[in-house]
């Protein structure tokens, strides 16, 4: 049996339960809409400035917050582009920042704070 280079679902669930990060990859050869990339993922309940700093330093891409439609509507987010022409059709909203408890909005602390505030079901 060929050994996989990928973690099992069970292993990823254990990582999430331990407040850990994992890399979620897609495969362009399976779907033409895929970007053939990996994303660092962590639970919003676990994210802290150290995680944000790690993402910014090592992944060097956008730091995004995945959110369901109900929560995004609840906090008043709208799509950045109502007619999405991108290949992946990713539903990006405008950039956000917490109203309170942040300074410039760009620091790892401010970004982690914004994620915590935006993902709070009582927001």
Explain the meaning of each model-derived region.
Residues 1-123:
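Catalytic domains of riboflavin
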